[in-house]
Every structure is written in C-alpha cells, then in structure tokens.
UniProtKB/Swiss-Prot annotation:
One of its GO terms (molecular function) is DNA binding. Residues 15-34 bind DNA. Keywords: DNA-binding, Repressor, Transcription, Transcription regulation. Residues 6-58 form the HTH cro/C1-type domain. The defective prophage of Bacillus subtilis 168, PBSX, is a chromosomally based element which encodes a non-infectious phage-like particle with bactericidal activity. PBSX is induced by agents which elicit the SOS response. CDD domains: HTH_XRE. Repressor of PBSX. Binds to four sites close to its own gene. Necessary for the maintenance of the lysogenic state. This is HTH-type transcriptional regulator Xre. Gene3D superfamilies: lambda repressor-like DNA-binding domains. It comes from the Bacteria. It comes from Bacillus subtilis (strain 168). The keyword GTP-binding does not apply. The keyword Ubl conjugation does not apply.
Amino acid sequence: MIGGRLKSLRGKRTQEEIASHIGVSRARYSHYENGRSEPDYDTLQKLADYFQVTTDYLLTGKDKKSDDDMFSDPDLQLAYRDMQDFSPESKQQAIEFINYLKEKEKNRKPKNK
C-alpha cells in the first residue's frame, strides 16, 4: 500500500513540509499516508521526485531496474542534479569529458595475461 511507503520515506519530515512541496494540503497528504485516498498521476510523480524513488516503487514497493539504480552514490546524485541547470553546450562538454574519462579508465585497467 502506498501509504506505508510514504510514511516510511517521510522519516522525520513533517506531513506539512511534504504537502507544501508537492502542492497539496496537509490533510490531503495525510489521506495518502492513511490510505483514505490515492494521489493522481501528477501528484504521484511529484512524490516520487521528492523522495527520489520511482513511481513503480511508490505503487508496488518494487523498483524495476531503472536509471535510479545508477545513482546510489551520493556524489553522482549531486553531480547529476548540478548538471540539470547546465546549458545544452555545457551538458555536451560534460558528456564528452565523461566519455574521455571512461576511455582513459578502460586503458588503465590491466589486461588478463
């Protein structure tokens, strides 16, 4: 049930804090947690974004294999968030630099003899 997952994800945050962030009243958010109502798709997506989980996780408790799995490292999460504000040119440069580092790393690994 989505309510239990929302309660667990909320942790020490208040219902008011989360409700404000996703644009619903505290009472409405409370209804989601208590199973009295289900969020619509847009609200579900906002909740998933806020908690940094997939909508699949919120709905089923299971995360299908997704790009989110690649971001378990906090440093990578931060880098990804920072890149969201980059211009298209800067994003392209970042991608090219990452590809350069990937090639460099591949060439550093010792080959099996």
